[in-house]
Amino acid sequence: MKPLVEKGIISVEVETMYRNPEISGNGYKTVVSLNPAQTAVAEDFKNRYDQGIRETSLLYGVTGSGKTEVYMEMIRHVLAKGRQVIVLIPEIALTYQTVLRFYRQFGRQVSVINSRMSAGERYDQFERAEKGDVTVMIGPRSALFTPFPKLGLIVIDEEHESAYKSELSPRYHARETAEELARMNGASVVLGSATPSLEAYTRAKTGQYRLYRLAERAKK
Protein backbone atom coordinates (compact mmCIF):
# COMPACT_ATOMS: atom_id res chain seq x y z
CA MET A 1 0.00 0.00 0.00
CA LYS A 2 2.84 2.41 0.81
CA PRO A 3 4.10 2.59 -2.83
CA LEU A 4 0.56 3.40 -4.01
CA VAL A 5 0.32 6.19 -1.47
CA GLU A 6 3.72 7.58 -2.48
CA LYS A 7 2.65 7.62 -6.14
CA GLY A 8 -0.54 9.46 -5.28
CA ILE A 9 -2.73 6.67 -6.59
CA ILE A 10 -4.53 6.27 -3.29
CA SER A 11 -4.77 8.33 -0.14
CA VAL A 12 -4.99 7.13 3.43
CA GLU A 13 -6.89 8.81 6.22
CA VAL A 14 -6.26 7.79 9.82
CA GLU A 15 -9.14 8.07 12.28
CA THR A 16 -8.85 7.07 15.92
CA MET A 17 -11.76 5.02 17.21
CA TYR A 18 -11.99 4.86 21.00
CA ARG A 19 -13.58 2.04 22.94
CA ASN A 20 -15.75 4.50 24.78
CA PRO A 21 -18.28 3.35 27.39
CA GLU A 22 -21.10 5.46 26.03
CA ILE A 23 -23.32 7.24 28.51
CA SER A 24 -26.87 7.57 27.28
CA GLY A 25 -29.43 9.94 28.68
CA ASN A 26 -32.01 12.56 27.88
CA GLY A 27 -29.60 15.33 26.99
CA TYR A 28 -27.72 17.42 29.51
CA LYS A 29 -27.34 20.93 30.92
CA THR A 30 -30.13 20.43 33.42
CA VAL A 31 -30.54 23.38 35.76
CA VAL A 32 -29.28 22.89 39.30
CA SER A 33 -30.65 25.32 41.86
CA LEU A 34 -28.67 25.67 45.07
CA ASN A 35 -30.20 26.63 48.37
CA PRO A 36 -28.58 29.39 50.48
CA ALA A 37 -26.36 26.97 52.43
CA GLN A 38 -25.12 25.25 49.27
CA THR A 39 -24.58 28.60 47.58
CA ALA A 40 -22.51 29.90 50.49
CA VAL A 41 -20.20 26.90 50.29
CA ALA A 42 -19.82 27.06 46.51
CA GLU A 43 -19.23 30.81 46.47
CA ASP A 44 -16.58 30.65 49.18
CA PHE A 45 -14.76 27.91 47.29
CA LYS A 46 -14.93 29.86 44.03
CA ASN A 47 -13.72 33.09 45.60
CA ARG A 48 -10.74 31.38 47.19
CA TYR A 49 -9.97 29.53 43.98
CA ASP A 50 -9.99 32.81 42.07
CA GLN A 51 -7.56 34.23 44.62
CA GLY A 52 -5.14 31.44 43.76
CA ILE A 53 -5.68 29.60 47.04
CA ARG A 54 -5.14 25.88 46.53
CA GLU A 55 -6.10 23.82 49.55
CA THR A 56 -7.91 20.75 50.81
CA SER A 57 -11.48 21.31 52.01
CA LEU A 58 -13.84 19.01 53.87
CA LEU A 59 -17.50 19.29 52.89
CA TYR A 60 -19.22 17.81 55.94
CA GLY A 61 -22.87 17.46 55.01
CA VAL A 62 -25.65 15.30 56.33
CA THR A 63 -27.12 12.66 54.03
CA GLY A 64 -29.39 14.37 51.51
CA SER A 65 -27.88 17.82 52.05
CA GLY A 66 -26.96 18.16 48.38
CA LYS A 67 -23.20 17.71 48.40
CA THR A 68 -23.22 16.48 44.80
CA GLU A 69 -24.88 19.69 43.59
CA VAL A 70 -22.17 21.68 45.35
CA TYR A 71 -19.47 19.56 43.73
CA MET A 72 -21.00 20.29 40.34
CA GLU A 73 -20.94 24.04 40.91
CA MET A 74 -17.29 23.83 41.98
CA ILE A 75 -16.48 21.69 38.95
CA ARG A 76 -18.24 24.11 36.61
CA HIS A 77 -16.13 26.97 37.97
CA VAL A 78 -12.86 25.07 37.60
CA LEU A 79 -13.70 23.97 34.05
CA ALA A 80 -14.41 27.60 33.14
CA LYS A 81 -10.81 28.34 34.12
CA GLY A 82 -9.59 25.86 31.53
CA ARG A 83 -8.65 23.23 34.11
CA GLN A 84 -9.65 19.59 34.46
CA VAL A 85 -11.28 17.60 37.24
CA ILE A 86 -11.09 14.12 38.77
CA VAL A 87 -14.10 12.88 40.76
CA LEU A 88 -13.52 9.83 42.93
CA ILE A 89 -16.53 7.76 43.92
CA PRO A 90 -16.36 4.40 45.73
CA GLU A 91 -16.83 1.53 43.29
CA ILE A 92 -19.97 0.35 45.09
CA ALA A 93 -21.57 3.77 44.57
CA LEU A 94 -20.39 4.19 40.97
CA THR A 95 -23.78 3.49 39.42
CA TYR A 96 -25.23 4.49 36.09
CA GLN A 97 -27.54 6.99 37.78
CA THR A 98 -24.64 8.62 39.62
CA VAL A 99 -22.62 9.09 36.45
CA LEU A 100 -25.69 10.26 34.55
CA ARG A 101 -26.12 13.18 36.96
CA PHE A 102 -22.69 14.48 35.97
CA TYR A 103 -23.26 13.74 32.30
CA ARG A 104 -26.45 15.79 32.31
CA GLN A 105 -24.46 18.74 33.60
CA PHE A 106 -21.27 18.48 31.56
CA GLY A 107 -22.16 16.29 28.58
CA ARG A 108 -19.35 14.65 26.63
CA GLN A 109 -16.73 16.38 28.73
CA VAL A 110 -17.35 13.50 31.16
CA SER A 111 -15.71 10.09 31.00
CA VAL A 112 -15.74 7.21 33.46
CA ILE A 113 -13.49 4.32 34.35
CA ASN A 114 -14.26 1.32 36.53
CA SER A 115 -12.99 -2.15 37.33
CA ARG A 116 -15.33 -3.79 34.82
CA MET A 117 -13.60 -2.12 31.89
CA SER A 118 -10.88 -3.88 29.94
CA ALA A 119 -7.31 -2.61 30.02
CA GLY A 120 -7.82 -1.32 26.49
CA GLU A 121 -10.93 0.63 27.43
CA ARG A 122 -9.16 2.22 30.37
CA TYR A 123 -6.21 3.10 28.14
CA ASP A 124 -8.55 4.81 25.68
CA GLN A 125 -10.09 6.97 28.39
CA PHE A 126 -6.69 7.98 29.74
CA GLU A 127 -5.56 8.87 26.22
CA ARG A 128 -8.66 11.00 25.68
CA ALA A 129 -7.95 12.78 28.96
CA GLU A 130 -4.35 13.44 28.03
CA LYS A 131 -5.44 14.90 24.69
CA GLY A 132 -8.07 17.08 26.34
CA ASP A 133 -11.04 15.35 24.71
CA VAL A 134 -12.56 14.89 28.18
CA THR A 135 -12.18 17.23 31.14
CA VAL A 136 -14.03 15.37 33.93
CA MET A 137 -12.97 11.84 34.85
CA ILE A 138 -15.17 9.89 37.24
CA GLY A 139 -14.12 6.64 38.84
CA PRO A 140 -12.83 4.76 41.88
CA ARG A 141 -9.40 5.39 43.38
CA SER A 142 -7.60 4.32 40.17
CA ALA A 143 -9.04 7.39 38.43
CA LEU A 144 -6.43 9.39 40.36
CA PHE A 145 -3.90 8.32 37.77
CA THR A 146 -5.74 10.06 34.92
CA PRO A 147 -3.01 11.96 33.01
CA PHE A 148 -4.72 15.34 32.88
CA PRO A 149 -2.22 18.01 31.78
CA LYS A 150 -4.15 20.83 33.50
CA LEU A 151 -5.58 19.26 36.63
CA GLY A 152 -7.42 21.85 38.70
CA LEU A 153 -9.59 19.95 41.18
CA ILE A 154 -9.92 16.53 42.78
CA VAL A 155 -13.23 15.65 44.46
CA ILE A 156 -13.36 12.62 46.76
CA ASP A 157 -16.94 11.71 47.57
CA GLU A 158 -17.61 9.55 50.66
CA GLU A 159 -14.01 10.15 51.69
CA HIS A 160 -14.41 7.95 54.77
CA GLU A 161 -14.84 4.76 52.71
CA SER A 162 -12.22 2.06 53.23
CA ALA A 163 -12.25 1.39 49.47
CA TYR A 164 -9.95 4.39 49.06
CA LYS A 165 -7.13 2.41 50.67
CA SER A 166 -5.18 0.09 48.41
CA GLU A 167 -3.95 -2.93 50.35
CA LEU A 168 -2.13 -4.37 47.35
CA SER A 169 1.22 -3.18 46.07
CA PRO A 170 1.67 -0.34 45.46
CA ARG A 171 -0.08 0.52 48.74
CA TYR A 172 -1.56 4.00 48.87
CA HIS A 173 -4.43 5.99 50.32
CA ALA A 174 -6.42 7.95 47.76
CA ARG A 175 -6.78 10.98 50.04
CA GLU A 176 -3.05 11.33 50.71
CA THR A 177 -2.21 10.63 47.08
CA ALA A 178 -4.76 13.19 45.90
CA GLU A 179 -3.26 15.86 48.14
CA GLU A 180 0.23 15.24 46.79
CA LEU A 181 -1.05 15.16 43.21
CA ALA A 182 -2.88 18.44 43.80
CA ARG A 183 0.25 20.02 45.25
CA MET A 184 2.24 19.01 42.16
CA ASN A 185 -0.39 20.40 39.78
CA GLY A 186 -1.54 23.53 41.59
CA ALA A 187 -4.97 22.01 42.18
CA SER A 188 -7.48 21.93 45.04
CA VAL A 189 -8.96 18.91 46.81
CA VAL A 190 -12.52 18.65 48.12
CA LEU A 191 -13.43 15.79 50.46
CA GLY A 192 -17.10 15.06 51.01
CA SER A 193 -18.86 12.94 53.60
CA ALA A 194 -21.79 12.73 55.98
CA THR A 195 -19.54 10.74 58.33
CA PRO A 196 -16.01 12.01 57.74
CA SER A 197 -12.99 10.01 58.76
CA LEU A 198 -11.34 10.93 62.03
CA GLU A 199 -8.22 12.07 60.19
CA ALA A 200 -10.09 14.40 57.85
CA TYR A 201 -12.33 15.84 60.57
CA THR A 202 -9.40 16.46 62.91
CA ARG A 203 -7.47 18.24 60.18
CA ALA A 204 -10.51 20.37 59.40
CA LYS A 205 -11.09 21.30 63.04
CA THR A 206 -7.42 22.22 63.53
CA GLY A 207 -7.31 24.40 60.43
CA GLN A 208 -5.27 22.12 58.20
CA TYR A 209 -8.32 21.73 55.96
CA ARG A 210 -11.01 24.28 55.23
CA LEU A 211 -14.28 23.10 56.78
CA TYR A 212 -17.65 23.53 55.10
CA ARG A 213 -20.89 22.38 56.74
CA LEU A 214 -24.27 21.47 55.29
CA ALA A 215 -26.29 20.74 58.40
CA GLU A 216 -29.73 20.25 56.86
CA ARG A 217 -31.23 18.15 54.10
CA ALA A 218 -31.80 20.01 50.87
CA LYS A 219 -35.45 20.61 50.06
CA LYS A 220 -36.61 19.14 46.78
What are these model-predicted stretches?
Residues 1-195, 200, 205-219:
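Accessory, non-ATPase domains that flank or precede helicase/AAA+ motor cores in DNA-metabolism machines
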